[in-house]
């Protein structure tokens, strides 16, 4: 089925996303001190960090697959993808901390998967969180990933008929 093909494509990109993340971590931990800056402190919950990165990568990849399924050409998909990520990042608290926004916008932030990803990463890096403190964010991100994946699969299946 097409869902199997989508899963195969997603597996590759999830691994790629995770590699990118861990390369950036290594740069923060190893390269920053060489430049005279403080080393990145990644906390102590390595398993929780790995699982969080896996779930965030799966959600991001599922969103990319959804965009690729909805649009028929890269020229259609690329602008939408870029603009939608900028909007979701603004809504989700990437630009401005959600805590300083009005109550209504704080609720709106919860509609962005980027909000939940940032919250999980901040919990692990800044608040020395564990899997017990990020499980809610990971479940919500998995829900987003599942919805994106199902819509992509249904869209592509209908297109192939």
Positions of predicted regions on the chain:
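Short secondary-structure boundary segments
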Residues: 129, 153-154
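Small-residue-rich segments of transmembrane alpha-helices in multi-pass membrane proteins
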Residues: 85-91
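Central hydrophobic cores of alpha-helical transmembrane segments
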Residues: 80-84, 109-112
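Short cytosolic juxtamembrane segments of multi-pass membrane proteins
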Residues: 154-161
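Residue-level detector of alpha-helical segments with a strong bias toward transmembrane helices
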Residues: 18, 102-103, 155
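Membrane-interfacial helix-loop-helix junctions in multi-pass membrane proteins
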Residues: 93-147
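Alpha-helical transmembrane segments and their short interhelical loops
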Residues: 2, 6-79, 86, 132-136, ...
């Amino acid at each position: 089925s097409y869902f199997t093909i989508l899963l195969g494509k997603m597996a590759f990109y999830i691994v790629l996303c995770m590699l990118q993340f861990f390369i950036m971590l290594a740069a923060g931990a190893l390269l920053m001190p060489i430049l005279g800056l403080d080393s990145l402190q990644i906390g102590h919950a390595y398993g929780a960090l790995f699982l969080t990165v896996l779930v965030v990568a799966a959600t991001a990849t599922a969103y990319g697959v959804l965009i690729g399924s909805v649009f028929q050409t890269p020229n259609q998909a690329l602008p939408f993808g870029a603009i939608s990520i900028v909007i979701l990042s603004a809504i989700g608290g990437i630009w401005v901390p959600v805590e300083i926004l009005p109550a209504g916008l704080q609720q709106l932030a919860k509609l962005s998967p980027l909000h939940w990803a940032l919250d999980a990463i901040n919990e692990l890096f800044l608040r020395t969180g564990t899997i017990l403190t990020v499980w809610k964010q990971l479940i919500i991100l998995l829900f987003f990933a599942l919805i994106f994946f199902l819509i992509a699969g249904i869209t592509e299946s209908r297109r192939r008929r």
